[in-house]
């Protein structure tokens, strides 16, 4: 076979949303450009960082890389979604600006999607790393055991279960999506938390399949001041609770993912209880009673979902 006759790798779009992390960003970008899968476009979405990373990125001299810099902060979710909407590849993946890939990340995951047209998301195991890039062995073992314990390599049909219930697909940086399978314009741009859950919901509602590779091909960095740490305050916990309550309610009401309804109801009530507790801590019993009545009227708390919650607990 002549070189010109070799099959052409389909284009993969890599989106890196970034804000004020120039050093980590450069590490993430280099891990993308070092991929053995060469046919990719890398779109760095800078969300109005104090220091413009464009000169640093341009100096890398790679034509596959382009930078989109917003003149104002448009929010984390909007930054991710607009990047995905700009993508032109057959496949798209979102890498955190502080996360890293093994050089074979794309070469291991994308061919499985090419070979299996029904697969809309391909994902792998991942390591947790600290601020200095050291692997957190205990955390890595715990997360993979909790979400992927016993999961076999190969194609799996139930994205509702793996993406939303067991949360086996729990890190965007460790997953690749078929771009045209995801309805990107359905993602609420003001979503404060749970972007990964929402993308997996959109993948699940296609009724298609996913592929799992148990190799640790991605590294997810845990930082002291990550967005998840905002939930430590009462205000942050209430915002987190309301946001999550809202999207679990969306999932619950969607017939396309009906197999997960008992679990979605539990998660909805779990977050409603979190909102209720925050209101009690902030404003006292009278305000929390009003909140309780409002949540009951909205259907966020029901006896059935509370019974399920008591039986199965948190996941």
Locate the predicted segments by residue:
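Glycine-rich, basic loop-to-helix element that forms the pyrophosphate-binding segment
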Residues: 53, 70-87, 97-100
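N-proximal low-complexity "stem/linker" segments adjacent to membrane-targeting elements
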Residues: 1-33
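Conserved donor NDP-sugar-binding/catalytic core segment of glycosyltransferases
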Residues: 104-141
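A conserved acidic beta->alpha catalytic loop
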Residues: 38, 46-55, 72, 96
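Conserved nucleotide-sugar donor-binding catalytic segment
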Residues: 147-233
């Amino acid at each position: 076979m002549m070189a010109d006759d070799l099959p052409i790798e389909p284009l993969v779009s890599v989106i890196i949303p970034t804000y004020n992390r120039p050093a980590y960003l450069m590490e993430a970008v280099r891990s993308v450009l070092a991929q053995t899968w060469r046919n990719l476009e890398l779109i760095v979405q800078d969300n109005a960082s104090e220091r413009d990373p464009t000169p640093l990125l341009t100096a890398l001299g790679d034509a596959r890389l382009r930078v989109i810099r917003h003149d104002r902060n448009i929010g984390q979710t909007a930054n991710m979604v607009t990047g995905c909407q700009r993508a032109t590849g057959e496949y798209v993946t979102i890498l955190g600006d502080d996360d890293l890939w093994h050089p074979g990340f794309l070469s291991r995951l994308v061919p499985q999607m090419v070979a299996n047209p029904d697969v809309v998301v391909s994902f792998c195991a991942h390591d947790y790393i600290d601020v200095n890039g050291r692997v957190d062995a205990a955390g890595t073992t715990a997360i993979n055991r909790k979400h992927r314990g016993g999961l076999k390599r190969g194609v799996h049909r139930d994205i509702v279960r793996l993406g939303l219930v067991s949360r086996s697909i729990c890190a965007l940086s460790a997953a690749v999506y078929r771009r045209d399978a995801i309805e990107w314009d359905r993602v609420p741009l003001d979503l404060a938390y749970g972007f990964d859950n929402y993308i997996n919901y959109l993948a699940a509602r296609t009724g298609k399949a996913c592929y799992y590779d148990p190799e640790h091909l991605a590294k997810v960095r845990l930082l002291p001041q990550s967005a998840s740490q905002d939930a430590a305050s009462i205000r942050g916990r209430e915002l987190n609770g309301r946001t999550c309550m809202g999207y679990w309610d969306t999932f619950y009401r969607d017939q396309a993912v009906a197999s997960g309804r008992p679990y979605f109801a539990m998660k909805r009530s779990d977050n409603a209880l979190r909102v209720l507790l925050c209101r009690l801590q902030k404003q006292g019993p009278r305000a929390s009673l009003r909140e309780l009545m409002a949540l009951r009227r909205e259907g966020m708390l029901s006896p059935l979902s509370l019974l399920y919650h008591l039986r199965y607990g948190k996941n």
